[in-house]
Amino acid sequence: GLSGHKSIPLYGKAKAFRFAYDVVYTNVMSAGAYRGYGATQGLFAVESAVNELAEKMNMDPVTLREKNMVRQGQVMPAYYGETANSCALDRCMEKAKEMMKWDEKFPSRDMGNGKVRGVGVAMAMQGSGISAVDTASVGIKVNDDGFYSLLIGASDMGTGCDTILSQMA
């Protein structure tokens, strides 16, 4: 599912990877699919593991990500061997590090009185327009009465695409 498919490709240098999970129903929350279903859960698991690995290696978690993140032009074995033709993870991480003043705030500091100050990091990406995976088409037809018919292969799942696509037409 999306849990592994959208998270493991973040680290394009991985020579071996495996992802397994169990879906568990509880009486706490709804188990239905929502927008982004699966991807965020997988990203939380992978990024938590990367942070744990950085701690065990006594390495800055940003540095660990910078050394292993997928970059533009790199083949992503975990993403059907696709090439990352448009990818700015490296620039995003650099900008985020600068904006949150990472070098000043990492590692965490014990402030006394049971208080600790620190920062955390995680990254995510969303592939769009991936050949043979994310494909779509749109057609527009002028009817005899002068009105248009917009033919799309999408359903509005609360994202507002019905409204937006009709406005674009």
Language-model regions: role of each:
Residues 1-42, 113-169:
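Gly/Pro-rich active-site capping loops and adjacent beta-alpha segments
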Residues 10, 40, 61, 76-77:
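Proline-rich low-complexity regions
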Residues 37-40, 51, 55-56, 79-87, ...:
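Generic amphipathic alpha-helical segments used as scaffolds and interaction surfaces in large
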